């Protein structure tokens, strides 16, 4: 079963037949996905840890650049920054310093002990994984953390050239389990473990995972996530349970991503068809097509100058007309004014077509 799932992941992720999995999203808002997908993973990963913040509040915080209003929003902002950092370092070898940096990014201003961000737990700091009734895991003694984390980094960076081949998906999942098991930090270990799995997947060429949220699947059945972990411990370290659980979650995440892209592409195509017979000018249609392809992404007047090959004054006039039609909203960001497509842009265009 595991071998079949690994092959299925390769096919669905595009690695087996398309080395550049970004092609999957070329025609469906790649820029928007590049910004919003890390946020979706940040939200669901944080919600797994108890953050109550909603998707709409988190999206508003990231888009406007406002400061977090509570602990939940701080966790999400930290996760978002960590996901962006993972993309930056995907081609770098994993080091202890990078693990500590990720932990600091993920937990900054969220811990009961502020000084615990970015450092291993000390021998006098008791850590366990439990709910109100049951202790699921008591991590190994803190004295072994330095050695174990060095070993984990060596494992993560192993390219198999010495003959010790391991499927890349398996390696990423083992990294996830290993860090979770060792629990090297006072808190935030689950977030770091999932971050390392993403780093490993991206480093191995599974670039589609820059856009796929695995935590969104784990959040739907957190008890199964915990159960898969505890089964490994109670069965003499047999990782099969966790590998099967995680490969199933990855496949479901890929399926949901594919469905989302399909829905998005069809909706955009339908809306673009509406524009062809609309009362908007050619320049306005050009701008609206870009807005449809990149929902939630800022439109600057300089962008319109480029798309339509017009002067600044003409581009500004076009954007004001679209604003007056209720199709875009103007916001001030720093010293500049930018425009954002309204969230119900497609619905408004459909209504315009009926009139």
Report residues per predicted region.
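FIC/Doc superfamily catalytic core
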Residues: 1-355
